[in-house]
């Protein structure tokens, strides 16, 4: 891509704005070197990196990249055996810390299931040098000062040095507190001269303290004297400072030698972190601009929805739809100057450069932009004074250069094509240049104010007209691009609005040839119809967006509903299974108990014990519970067709096939909802055959073999209870409201057992002994619910 084109389209201003979002000089340097790529796969990867960066910003707000520094020069010094200073070592340690934090940050995101194939792969390349990082952290602070914890020797030296300095200050402060201090000292302060502690003594008392004079005031009236009593202490202090310096140099050399063994790893970490900073800068820039990741086309197709020029005020800029490469490859934008035609050219050109640089573009979702090998632009007055070229000559020189380099993977932007010369010749040249550009296979957008080019879009199948809307009421352009509508002259309307006599306007109209006037009237009518259609389209699109949002909400609610339903069903099944298991265990225990009683012999068992055990066995029997989910019988393979009735397995709902999206997916109508369903999630439902109407009759009839009474006299206890259980079921099915159980009076054991059993039967409403006429207490009357 030519740098000249980047300058014309003001791509450098985009890069300048982008640098404000970088966190380090490494990110800024990557931005300064940024240039549009021309390889489709490279552009695709760059866009995916930016999209992944944007995903991270959406999820986490930021990334732990703060603290990254350019340390490549430091590593060069280590490479040749040099030692680093404290600040340089700290900066390398800071990069190691950022490397570790960034790797942990990315690991957390990946473990959460966030799809980050490119940025995740970058984090795999980061090497964590925890020990080296910790050695630096305990040795150097952010200002580059060597810490006491760097070595035991340094800590000891500094403790001794502090004590020595305290002794010096204490001795000098005693002079300041002396009662004669105000007379002999110019000021009651301790200061430093030549790195020695001194006090300011008046000239006439210089011999009082002895010692060494290190300096004097400008007037000579004050001498800065190191008293003899602290000379030795100051000497000791200087010696300790020398030891401190020597130990610091040793520590720096030791750390430098350690870092020298990791030069390649630190270099690569720093490079990777610089890439991260660059990618996150692109993502934050896109967010600030409310930009989107475009679809990319390697077939020259452009379909920008509500595209905005990124350098214009976002609150006032007019968004336009721009499409090219499908129905036509050339757009000729006609109409008067100052109508916003050039802005359209620059918007398309600049957004193309941005997209091919891996930047998101200011447009709506689902916008598509092409990847071109070349972008050429002949925009503005590039007249060269040095070359003494006219405007026309300058443009023509540029166009000649473009036509020499252009190919089928090129985008050409011509501004005011053919301008600067005789209108008739200029229009003819413009048409010939457009034809030549098309023959080379290029995609072209050109602006012109020549009316002769209005016919170009109609006469060439590869071309279409366009114009920028003009509001006659306000006498200003709306900057709205109208593709398919040629520009028209508004001179008469504007003149009338400005007060020109109607007679003059009428005469002027008569001088315009009829064909031209009819064309302008036709264009005017076409504009009105287009505006109406566009308004209705926008309203329809807004309704469609609302309906789409509602559909997505409904689909989400339906999915949540069935997920919750499945969850509750699963919980119910588990609970039911537990009840059944518990009941089975309890029943087995009771049966075992009964068998034990039988083995012990009836003589040793009381009747009420048997009754109690049998009753507990009845209670242990649970209500019928399905422990397994009914499985649909396996069907023969069915070739799905439009209109088939199906069951959506994941939702448990029936639906109808609307249309086939692919071999793996269908559109299915489920009630009022239309959903995309995978073929593997569908089960064919056979059409139901009409069923014959059945006449339902009463369960019991006059010739029912079930009697209204059961005679148990002479029966053994266990056999009697089994007969009662079976008889009650038959009586219920026969429809009896009540029945009689004849058990006799006897010892009362059978009567007691039957009574206890009936009390616990779920279908028995009440029981009573029979009246005298019914058999007295030898009969139990049972009333059903």
Swiss-Prot record:
- What's this protein's function? Endonuclease that is involved in the suppression of homologous recombination and thus may have a key role in the control of bacterial genetic diversity.
Q: Which residues form the Smr domain?
A: 710-785
Note the superkingdom of the native organism: Bacteria
EC no.? 3.1.-.-, 3.6.4.-
Name a single GO biological process: rescue of stalled ribosome
Native source species: Listeria welshimeri serovar 6b (strain ATCC 35897 / DSM 20650 / CCUG 15529 / CIP 8149 / NCTC 11857 / SLCC 5334 / V8)
Which Pfam families does this one have? MSSS, MutS_V, Smr
Query: What family is this?
Result: Belongs to the DNA mismatch repair MutS family. MutS2 subfamily.
- Residues that hold ATP according to the record: 335-342
What is its EC class? Answer: hydrolase
Keyword tags: ATP-binding, DNA-binding, Endonuclease, Hydrolase, Nuclease, Nucleotide-binding, RNA-binding, rRNA-binding
Source organism lineage? Bacteria, Bacillati, Bacillota, Bacilli, Bacillales
SUPFAM superfamilies xrefs: DNA repair protein MutS, domain III, P-loop containing nucleoside triphosphate hydrolases, SMR domain-like
What name has this protein been given in UniProt? Endonuclease MutS2
Q: NCBIfam families recorded for this chain?
A: mutS2
InterPro entries from the xrefs? DNA_mismatch_repair_MutS_C, DNA_mismatch_repair_MutS_core, DNA_mismatch_repair_MutS_sf, MSSS, MutS, MutS2, P-loop_NTPase, Smr_dom
The family database entries (HAMAP family) matched by this protein are listed as: MutS2
**DNA-binding as a keyword?**
yes
Partners and quaternary state?
A: Homodimer. Binds to stalled ribosomes, contacting rRNA.
**Annotated transmembrane regions:** none
Question: Which GO molecular-function terms appear in the entry?
Answer: ATP binding; ATP hydrolysis activity; ATP-dependent DNA damage sensor activity; endonuclease activity; mismatched DNA binding; ribosomal large subunit binding; rRNA binding
């Amino acid at each position: 891509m030519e740098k000249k084109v980047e300058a014309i389209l003001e791509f450098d201003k985009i890069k300048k704005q982008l640098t404000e979002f970088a966190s380090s000089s490494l990110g800024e340097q990557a931005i300064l070197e940024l240039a549009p790529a021309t390889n489709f796969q490279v552009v695709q990867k760059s866009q995916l990196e930016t999209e992944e960066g944007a995903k991270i910003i959406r999820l986490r707000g930021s990334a732990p990249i703060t603290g990254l520094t350019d340390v490549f020069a430091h590593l060069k010094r280590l490479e040749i055996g040099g030692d680093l200073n404290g600040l340089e070592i700290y900066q390398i340690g800071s990069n190691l810390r950022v490397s570790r934090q960034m790797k942990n940050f990315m690991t957390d995101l990946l473990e959460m299931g966030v799809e980050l194939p490119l940025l995740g792969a970058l984090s795999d390349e980061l090497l964590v040098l925890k020990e080296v990082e910790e050695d630096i952290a305990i040795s150097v602070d952010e200002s580059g000062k060597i810490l006491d914890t760097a070595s035991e020797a340094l800590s000891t030296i500094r403790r001794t040095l502090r004590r020595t300095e305290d002794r010096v200050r204490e001795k000098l402060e005693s002079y300041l507190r002396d009662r004669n201090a105000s007379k002999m000292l110019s000021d009651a302060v301790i200061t430093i001269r030549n790195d020695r502690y001194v006090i300011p003594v008046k000239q006439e008392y210089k011999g009082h303290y002895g010692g060494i004079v290190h300096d004097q005031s400008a007037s000579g009236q004050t001498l800065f004297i190191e008293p003899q009593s602290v000379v030795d202490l100051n000497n000791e202090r200087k010696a300790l400072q020398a030891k401190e310096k020597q130990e610091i140099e040793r520590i720096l050399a030791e750390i430098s030698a350690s870092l020298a063994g990791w030069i390649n790893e630190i270099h690569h970490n720093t490079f990777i972190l610089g890439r991260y900073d660059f990618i996150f800068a692109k993502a934050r820039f896109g967010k600030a601009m409310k930009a989107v990741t475009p679809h990319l086309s390697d077939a020259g197709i452009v379909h920008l929805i509500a595209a905005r020029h990124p350098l214009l005020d976002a609150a006032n800029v007019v968004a336009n739809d721009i499409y090219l490469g499908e129905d036509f490859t050339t757009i000729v934008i006609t109409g008067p100057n100052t109508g916003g035609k050039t802005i359209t050219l620059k918007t398309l050109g600049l957004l193309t450069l941005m997209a091919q640089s891996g930047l998101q573009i200011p447009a709506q979702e689902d916008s598509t932009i092409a990847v071109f090998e070349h972008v050429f632009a002949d925009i503005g007055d590039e007249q060269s004074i040095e070359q003494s070229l006219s405007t026309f000559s300058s443009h023509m020189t540029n166009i000649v250069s473009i036509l020499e380099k252009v190919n089928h993977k090129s985008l050409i932007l011509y501004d005011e094509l053919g301008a600067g010369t005789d209108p008739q010749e200029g229009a003819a040249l413009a048409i010939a240049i457009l034809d030549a550009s098309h023959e080379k296979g290029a995609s072209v957008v050109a602006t012109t104010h020549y009316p002769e080019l209005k016919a170009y879009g109609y006469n060439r199948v590869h071309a279409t007209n366009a114009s920028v809307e003009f509001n006659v009421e306000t006498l200003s352009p709306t900057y709205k691009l109208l593709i398919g509508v040629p520009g028209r002259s508004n001179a008469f309307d504007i003149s009338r609005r400005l007060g020109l006599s109607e007679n003059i306007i009428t005469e002027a109209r008569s001088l315009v040839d009829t064909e031209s006037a009819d064309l302008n009237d036709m264009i005017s009518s076409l504009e009105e119809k287009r505006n109406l259609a566009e308004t209705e389209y926008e309203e329809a699109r807004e309704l469609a967006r609302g309906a789409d949002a509602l559909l997505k909400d409904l689909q989400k609610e339906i999915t949540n509903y069935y997920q919750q339903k499945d969850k509750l069903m699963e919980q119910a099944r588990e609970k039911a299974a537990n009840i059944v298991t518990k009941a089975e265990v309890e029943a087995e225990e009771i049966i075992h108990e009964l068998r034990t009683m039988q083995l012990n012999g009836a003589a040793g068992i009381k009747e009420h014990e048997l009754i109690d055990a049998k009753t507990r066995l009845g209670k242990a029997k649970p209500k019928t519970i399905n422990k397994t989910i009914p499985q649909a019988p396996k069907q023969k393979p069915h070739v799905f067709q439009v209109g088939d009735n199906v069951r959506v397995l994941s939702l448990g709902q029936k639906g109808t096939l609307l249309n086939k999206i692919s071999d793996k997916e269908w559109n299915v109508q489920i009630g009022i909802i239309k959903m995309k369903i995978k073929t593997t999630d569908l089960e064919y439902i056979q059409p139901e055959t009409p069923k014959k109407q059945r006449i339902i009759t009463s369960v019991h009839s006059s010739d029912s073999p079930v009697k209204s009474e059961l005679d148990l006299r002479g029966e053994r206890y266990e056999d009697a209870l089994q007969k009662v259980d079976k008889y009650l079921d038959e009586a219920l099915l026969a429809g009896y409201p009540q029945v009689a159980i004849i058990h006799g009076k006897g010892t009362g054991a059978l009567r007691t057992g039957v009574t206890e059993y009936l009390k616990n039967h779920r279908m028995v409403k009440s029981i009573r002994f029979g009246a005298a006429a019914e058999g007295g207490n030898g009969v139990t009357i049972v009333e059903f619910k």
